[in-house]
């Protein structure tokens, strides 16, 4: 697998929406597409795409809080036919390192997700901080997780790359 990650561009929109739709309904309710469209039109932070063989196979971004020592991951998704290939881990590591390079680097990074994807984040070193039955308007349960973006975590990501930094056994 040879992927590259770069900033999202408006001409990526169609491929990003197609990647999102490939995950409906298993990972996203169709109703979240309007939120994605809004985020693409008026992002609150940087957005990125993962590209493999010239095709967009993943998408995600983050937002930084103006008032809190906090970054929030938004729309981390991989095209359904590429799940399990490591693209999600690479995109996650890229976003964490991008945040770490910011002038106002956040101390904590949070993400909210569905129970079926919470395990992915736990294997990448996130800890569960809240669980909300029916926490999404769609009726799905919500899980909130946090990653401590410490100097040690950043050094591990830089030194050994995303594969080794996010050990499959859950130790990060």
Per-region residue spans from a language model:
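Short amphipathic alpha-helix that is part of the acyltransferase structural core
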Residues: 1-34, 51, 156-172
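Short hydrophobic/aromatic beta-strand element in the GNAT-like acyltransferase core
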Residues: 45-49, 59, 75, 108, ...
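Conserved acetyl-CoA-binding loop-helix of GNAT-fold acetyltransferases
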Residues: 78, 84-97
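Conserved GNAT acetyl-CoA-binding A-motif
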Residues: 99-114
